[in-house]
């Protein structure tokens, strides 16, 4: 092979025009073209051996005239002819690209004529390196009939669709014989159809391997030099030629030459070797474990004896075969034989053999199809082919998988690897077929562990196969066991080069001069993207990414052979602390959307993770924008960041709806793995305006802003009390005061109830369940506090007692101090008032205004020149006060700089100056200090400079006061507008300067040419005039008289030529500046204004955070008294350093939680995230597109079944007409066909109506997709496995549910649970085991068992002594878990109230939000309405109260008096119930003979007072109980969602 053997010869991309550049004779070098000629050869006959029956033709198939004289002479006297001795090799003369004339839309197909003994590896090199084909994940070798044959229309359609689908979804190559006949033509037509439907961009690689000697029009392909580019190939066959045309729909051709002509089958051996060589090529994957040998599968369609021989040879090489039964000849014979095989044990091995009863029939078919000659050999090969059941699969059009022939092809390979589930998984991964993995690999029988899934998981991560990663996480893979430091580093080492993060990693590696990526490099890059406040734990956590990494590296160096095992053991002993977060960050940095989503959904702390992802993606998008070559990546990154921002807001919304208080705790808790930042800080860092604008954040900021003062405290009260502290007590209202008043009102209310209840005699109702409250500890309050309504009016606020949730309060954390509620003493009130950010703000505003007035007074009235002879240099005392005031402001700015979170001063400065106001502060203070220094010089000019600087500096101090307006909702956004317009103006000035300077220079050069009498000799005047006059002219001061030379004394003498040219230049200049540029500036300002105005509310809310954060951390006093606060801070710092060894944390907007509290909060947040994810999935599945797609799938299924029936009916009719009773049979068939047509017409009309209904009524946003056919068809009652068992129901399609529909093959599974068969008192006798069966009193009251057997749905049918489910078949007979045959009556009390927040009753979409008492079932952990079975002799009303008490209220040891009080309140509630539903329940426990029916009654606590002080506590029958929001997005047990929907409609509530 030449030195240029890896130089690409063919570009597999868009080739219809690219070949002109790449393969034209002018561009393609001679050396590249000759590579093929040097490495591939053809064969020519060198010995003419005449045929016995035709002496004019050689045994090679060519006539005498096509042989050389030497060949004619050497063949004289010879009778034997063979390829080895009678042919010789020559460089190939047929290669290039075929352009099929008349097929202009087709891409040109590369082709090559080669010898039959060519090295197969050389062919693979040609395809991969020269023709640039991608390594396939599968090779489908199609074989069969070489001559034209007819397929049934439906089989032809299935074959075409399935073959192309298999190739496209797996990235497969299809190999055929390449000619335009037989099975090859069917394959070509399938490809053509696919390209017509989806365009030529979706090309499938179809490789034709044909015999050169049978190809028609060989001369069109031959070129003695440099190949043909293109080779024009006409599809008109040559008259009289016995060969075949090449198929124009193939993409590549190999023409195998053994020197013969007209001989078929020459290519078989070469094709087999090529396929064998392909199997040794590894598939393309970033993971070594993900690279497998390319699998090959044989697809057999029709065919003759050679087809059977091909199957035989390939199956011996362990290539599985798929036979299309019903396609004719060989395929049908093999299919028939396969369907009549039995298993037999031979020499300890189980093999398939043809059933002896059918051997003669199979032999007869072989003779019938192939003829008697060679029948025994063919039969023997068929027997051998069928022996290994794993290696052969028969696809039947009428079989169970007839709808998906692609699955049959792929499952054949899985079947061949049945003994190795890991190999099967690798195949599914390579094909990216998640459907196969779910249905055939991850089954109940196969158990998976982290160890077996680790390699596949690494492949899924590296190859961005998110669905597989999700599947692995759901089926036994533990991320904690899987992820090690070694794998994490490998993930970052394999980051694709086209990502934004790759250059950043390489840059950091270059700085450190390292060749491999370690986590310290990654941590540095993450810190760079996150900003100076963030400190990655990859860098600071020395245990996991420092000491452990070094220890592991040392072990690897010492024990190279077992390094993987050592690292795995280390990972088991001491796993990484946050594996999900680690891999999630990698996926985000690689911008892998679906993978990031999967890992985010599975990980912890979803809100913080989403916000961090948003920040990282936005920063990477900003970096990408700086590179103009990757702007598309930038937009994609921004869109990805927006998705995570939406997810963070969604999780926060769920948390807030569930519990307002805990949601605010989530916002301010310290997160260890996020550099001890809070979710609020991460949101600000990510500039997430939507997140900060959320109600939860804004309520929290309001609470922090007001401190412990009531939220409605007016500013003037604060202003008065700042200077008259004694008025704090009468006019300032504090939050703890409200709490204590509310608690006092509760106690009074309880006292009055106790007094009334003491007059009532103790009594106990017969059937009432005990309902009593429970004493709550702080821990229990943490779960139930927000779920209990408070006694009072409808508009009262909920309790906000953070110490109930966060009991660990530390003195140095002012955040916790602010949010605590405790009784305030005299000093506490004063301290809390002055430490509130709002009070600090008012004090600072007043102080700053006083400072401005003092500054103005000094500058305007008392700023004398410094005189050393006078006392204090003659400086006025007010000026000294001003100096001291500025000094205190400077000290405060230094304190703010030192208090910034970053550790290093450089990072502190960076964070400090990220706030524009801080830059203004430092600039104005620096200028002030310069002015004061100059002020003390006695030189008059220096003093004047000092006075001027000081006078100008006041501008910046006054402008600084604009920050005061940021607290206002209307004026705050205006400041943002001004800031953004200043940025626009800076860019505009650059453009304006170009025009101004250009015009100024031209104008001056025209008016005052130099040198000469009109030249100006003053350089400074010349320079200033170049800028001065154009600038003022822009504002309307045109200087017309001056530029026209009418004022020579003032302006100077103007050159005569300039007098007429200057006005013309001015006119042009004014057009550009005043008309074009200034209007452009106005348009830019207008756009900025509209953009900010649209989100003005969000902008203001986002600004609030900075304001609250600044004043939350400020000392109590404003300058100049702030110095006292600094002294106190210093004293405290010294005290803590001496006592504890570390400085105080200072005043922060954070809450520190104990590990146990963090765990509880994490679990609660994770549950809220799961709810949000479920709602999003419901929303997506409820879209019109998804519903139409699902409906389309079902229509396809129905269509397939109907076609199958029609085919069967057609066959029956044809058979009947040829039978002796043809007339009668014909009439019967006609009648059935007529009925079928009627049914088809009816189905078509129904489908059209369904589609119209879907289009007219799209789903309401956020509304759940509640099954409309709940009353028509049962779904959960047909689900498998049956609850509490492994029993699976008989499959019943929707159209077969009705008992009226004939279903002769219906064989329901008989199942009754052992607990029911034990014959408890609540169960009937087992009628299924009795013969004859005794008749129970169905459809009436059973007085013997004291059970009502009347159905709420009316009379039900009784057959063979058993009742039939009125809703239809369920696939199971017996009773399952139900005790009674027939209806089993239940009672479901739906106890509701209005959901309240601190602002009153919650509203959604203008409607009130309901919440109901929900219990978590112990058997399946699903949430449900509390309810249960109606016991024998029990009334429904009694059952409602009893079930509510048993499942929602615990049996607690409280006083009898308290029991009576609670019982009375429950009695009041249950006296006002409204029936919601009465009838059948779609319950998974239902069977054909036993089913659930219920009565659902709504008991509504409208004012919220009945449950105000009653605690919900799960009983023995429930795992948990809580108040749950009524929403269609919440998954509930059985048909409870539809019941709640009825409640919401009745109450006109949101759903």
Swiss-Prot record:
Binding site for Ca(2+): 893, 896, 918, 921
TM ranges: 838-858, 878-898, 917-937, 948-968, 981-1001, 1060-1080
Domain Nudix hydrolase as annotated: residue spans: 1394-1546
Residue intervals annotated with topology Cytoplasmic: 1-714, 731-837, 899-916, 969-980, 1081-1116, 1136-1551
Matching Pfam families: Ion_trans (PF00520), LSDAT_euk (PF18139), NUDIX (PF00293), TRPM2 (PF25508)
Segments in the Extracellular topological domain: 859-877, 938-947, 1002-1018, 1035-1059
Region of interest called Disordered, as start-end residue ranges on this chain: 744-767
UniProt-reported outcome of changing residue 1365 to D: Does not affect channel activity. Acquires sensitivity to oxidative stress
Residues forming coiled coils: 1184-1209
Family, similarity comment: Belongs to the transient receptor (TC 1.A.4) family. LTrpC subfamily. TRPM2 sub-subfamily.
Protein name: Transient receptor potential cation channel subfamily M member-like 2
Organism, scientific name: Nematostella vectensis
The encoding gene: TRPM2
